[in-house]
Structures are given as C-alpha cells and as structure tokens.
Amino acid sequence: MPDPMDTRAAWLSTPNHAMVEMARDLGYGKFVLDIEHGLFDFDPTDKLIALIKAMGLEVYAKVLGPTAVPIQQALDMGCDGVIIPHIGNLAHARKVTATAKYPPLGVRSFAGSRTSGYGGADDQWYADENTRSKCFPMIESAAALADVEAIVALDTVDGLFLGPSDLSLSRGRGAYRESDADMADLERAAEAANAAGKPWIMPAWTENERQAASALGAAFMVVADEYGSIFNGLFQARH
C-alpha cells in the first residue's frame, strides 16, 4: 500500500534546520524552500540544502524570480529541482526554463560545484544532470494558464507547480477561495500536465484541496508551511 507521506511536502520560509529534522522524523521526505518570499541568504541556504540532501531527502527551491542566476544557483547548490515564479506566456516560459537545462536542451551555465563533485564533467554528466534536476514553471498567471498545454510540452519543462492565490488574482477574481472557477483553472493545468505525462505539484493547505489534488493526480502537494505551523501551534496553546 502506498505511503501517503510520499505525496506530502513541507514548506520553509527560513533556513530552519530544526523544522527539517522535525518534519523528517514525522515522515516528510520533501521540502520546498520559498526563497522568493522567504528569508534565505546564500550561505545558510547552501548549508540547509546540503543537510537535506545528506539526510537522503528531496529539496526544491522556489527561486527569487524567472532569471538565470537564481535558477542556476539553486541547482548548483544541489536542489532536486527549481520552481520558477512569475512565468508569463509560452515565449517567456521557453526562454526562462532553458536556463535550468544544459545544452543542447537549454543554456544553463556550468559550475564545478556540489552537483559535479566539485570537479569537471563529461558529456554523460551533463545528460544525467538534465534528467536529475527538475524544472517546474509556476502556473500562477492568466498568461501562463492560457498557454499551459504548450508550456508543459516544452523539453525544458519537467512538470508544473500550480499557484492558486496569484492565479485567482491574475484572473480577476480577487482572493483565492477554492471557488468553482478557482478549481476549474487548477483542473485545466493539472489535466495539461497529466496529458503530457509530466508531474504537477500544488500547495494544498485544506482538506478539500488535498482531496482535489489527489483526485486529479498530483505528484505531491505541499501541506505544511513553517509560519503557519508555528502560528497554529501558538494559537492552539492558548486554549
């Protein structure tokens, strides 16, 4: 019987080693680092990624933005994949996701870092690294959703990360409420990934979201975030 924790991930907003250890002890095997909105400087981020990988766990970086340098830095540090925010239309997605893959697939620049054993690389290593490191553009804008079927078909794209809150804002609905329109947008993106045979991920903070994500075939879902976990613990302790 599949372990349900295989489809659960924890979300970090700071380089919190203790939370990684606690989550690991509770069965979490995947972590998303919210570098875009969180408090991550280079040195502690590098150490956190090294710790997570030394534990044999998976780590994905939601990078600062859709540009080459933050994407390459996260991959050079050893992340299993990058989650790229602020993706626009197909042309934009094609240009941005190319920075996550080495030639001939893309234009990623080489660094003799953790992923290459701090040394050089041969042709097979480049091919293997293109397979190992995953690229997940975010579908969180009206433009990205309009082109989602073409975006997920790109050779430089390994899957999708759905951003419900920003997608609802971009689509003119205001705050995300898990409305029928919200869920229809998420279903379209999920079905595009499923049809392409590629995984997709989403944050699923509520039981309704988790059930919907599971029914639609999410590869995994982010179900616990650092700030929310602390807040909820403090709130519950008042009573």
Pin down the residues of each PLM region:
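N-terminal amphipathic alpha-helix/helix-capping segment at the start of soluble metabolic enzymes
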Residues: 1-13, 121-131, 187-195
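Conserved N-terminal beta1-alpha1 strand-loop-helix module at the mouth
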Residues: 1-59, 63-67, 98, 135, ...
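Catalytic cores of alpha/beta
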Residues: 21, 25, 61, 66-80, ...
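Conserved beta-strand positions in the central sheet of alpha/beta enzyme cores
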Residues: 31-32, 83, 161, 201, ...
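Alpha-helix-loop-beta-strand connector modules within alpha/beta enzyme cores
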Residues: 42-68, 72-76, 98-106, 127-131, ...
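C-terminal helical cap(s) of enzyme catalytic domains, especially alpha/beta-barrels
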Residues: 48, 52, 90-106, 174, ...
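C-terminal alpha-helical cap/extension of soluble enzyme domains
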Residues: 67, 108-121, 133, 139-146, ...
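Conserved anion-binding
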Residues: 69, 81-155, 164-169
